[in-house]
C-alpha cells in the first residue's frame, strides 16, 4: 500500500512530517511517497538521522501557503506539493493522500482533482472529537459553511460508514446539532433536515442534540453545517486547553496540590492522552473518490503517523466504495419519494 504524503504541509514541516512518515513505515508496514522539496527533505533526513527506507521522494518546486487563496492556488501552483500529490492519487500512483497543509486548498483539490463520489458536490470535513463517554465524529467541521438538508443527509450517511468501517462501531447513532432536542426547534433548514434524516436509509438517526450534550459523547456521529461544526470544534479545543491549564495551576499552587498530583499522576496522564487530538490522526474529506486526510496544521510526528494509519484503515476497508454504495441507496430512496 502506498500513502502519498505532503512533506511541505504544516507548521513543523518537513521535519515532523518526515519523522511521522518514517514511524508509519516501521509500525504499519506501508510505503510512503513523499512529495516536496527533495533536496530539503533529504538534508533534513540526514541531519536528523531519519531513515528513508520505504519512503520514495517526488520533487516539486512550489508550496501552497496558508495565506494563498485556495482556488487560485490550486489553479496556478501546479508544481506544489498538494497539487502534485492529489494528481498522483487521481492517477493511481498511490492509495491515499495525507497533508497538514492548507485546509481550503485540500478541499478545492479534493473536489476538482480527485473528484467526488456520485451524489456529492463538495466533500465534508470530518474529525473525531474527544468526549466523556467516547469520541464522536463531527461533520462538517468547516469545509461547507452553508448546507442544504440533502447535504446533511449525505453527511449522515458518509459519517455512519466512516464510524462503522474505520472506528469499528456497529450501528452508529447519528444526531443533528440544533438549539433544542424537539423536532420543532431550529431554522427552517434544520427542521427540514430533521424530517429528511428520519427517513434516510442506512443510518440510525436519534434526533436533535443540543450543544451542551455533545461533549457527553452519547452519540457516534454529529451532523451540522460547516460553520456550526467549526464553532463546536474550536470551542471544544479551547475548553480542553483551559481545563488542563486550570488543573496545572491547581497542582502547582501549593504543597497540597503537588501531593495531590503525585497521587493522581496516572489519571491526569490518561486524561491528557484522551484529549490529545494527535491520537485521532487527521480529518478526512468524506465524499472524495479516494481517501484525502487533513492532518492538523500544528501536527508533530505522532499526528502525522496516526493520520497515515487512518489513511491505511480507510483503504483497507474500502471506505470510499462503501460510501458510494450507501449514497446510491440514498439517491434511490429519494427518487422513489419524488
Where are these regions (language model features)?
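Short glycine/serine/threonine-rich phosphate/pyrophosphate-binding segments
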Residues: 13-17, 79-92, 96-110, 117, ...
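Phosphate/nucleotide-donor binding subsite
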Residues: 49-94
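Glycine-rich phosphate/nucleotide-binding loop
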Residues: 111-124, 130-138, 218-222, 226-336
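Glycine-rich phosphate/diphosphate-binding loop of Rossmann-like nucleotide-binding domains
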Residues: 15-16, 31-33, 39, 145-207, ...
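Short, glycine-rich nucleotide/cofactor-binding loops
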Residues: 5-14, 143-153, 294-301
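Short helix-capping segments at alpha-helix termini
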Residues: 25-28, 46-54, 167, 197-203
Amino acid at each position: 500500500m502506498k500513502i502519498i504524503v505532503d512533506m511541505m504541509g504544516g507548521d513543523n514541516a518537513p521535519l515532523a512530517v518526515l519523522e511521522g512518515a518514517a514511524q508509519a513505515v516501521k509500525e504499519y508496514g506501508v510505503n510512503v511517497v513523499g512529495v516536496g522539496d527533495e533536496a530539503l527533505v533529504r538534508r533534513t533526513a540526514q541531519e536528523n538521522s531519519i531513515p528513508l527506507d520505504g519512503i520514495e521522494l517526488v520533487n516539486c518546486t512550489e508550496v501552497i501557503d496558508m495565506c494563498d487563496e485556495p482556488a487560485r492556488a490550486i489553479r496556478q501552483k501546479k508544481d506544489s506539493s498538494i497539487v502534485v500529490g492529489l494528481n498522483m492519487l487521481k492517477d493511481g500512483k498511490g492509495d491515499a493522500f495525507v497533508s497538514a497543509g492548507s485546509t481550503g486548498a485540500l478541499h478545492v483539490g479534493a473536489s476538482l482533482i480527485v473528484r467526488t463520489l456520485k451524489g456529492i458536490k463538495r466533500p465534508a470535513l470530518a474529525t473525531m472529537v474527544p468526549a466523556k463517554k467516547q469520541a464522536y465524529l463531527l461533520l462538517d467541521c468547516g469545509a461547507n459553511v452553508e448546507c442544504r438538508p440533502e447535504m446533511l443527509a449525505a453527511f449522515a450517511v458518509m459519517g455512519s460508514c466512516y464510524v462503522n468501517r474505520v472506528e469499528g462501531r456497529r450501528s452508529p447513532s447519528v444526531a443533528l446539532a440544533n438549539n433544542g432536542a424537539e423536532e420543532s426547534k431550529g431554522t427552517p433548514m434544520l427542521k427540514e433536515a430533521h424530517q429528511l434524516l428520519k427517513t434516510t436509509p442506512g443510518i440510525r438517526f436519534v434526533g436533535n442534540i443540543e450543544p451542551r450534550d455533545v461533549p457527553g459523547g452519547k452519540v457516534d456521529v454529529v451532523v451540522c453545517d460547516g460553520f456550526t461544526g467549526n464553532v463546536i470544534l474550536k470551542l471544544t479545543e479551547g475548553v480542553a486547553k483551559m481545563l488542563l491549564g486550570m488543573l496545572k495551576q491547581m497542582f502547582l499552587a501549593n504543597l497540597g496540590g503537588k501531593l495531590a498530583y503525585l497521587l493522581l499522576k496516572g489519571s491526569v496522564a490518561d486524561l491528557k492522552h484522551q484529549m490529545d487530538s494527535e491520537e485521532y490522526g487527521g480529518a478526512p474529506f468524506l465524499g472524495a473518490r479516494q481517501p484525502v486526510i487533513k492532518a492538523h496544521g500544528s501536527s508533530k510526528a505522532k499526528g502525522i503517523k496516526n493520520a497515515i494509519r487512518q489513511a491505511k484503515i480507510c483503504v483497507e476497508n474500502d471506505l470510499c466504495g462503501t460510501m458510494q454504495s450507501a449514497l446510491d441507496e440514498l439517491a434511490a430512496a429519494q427518487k422513489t419519494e419524488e
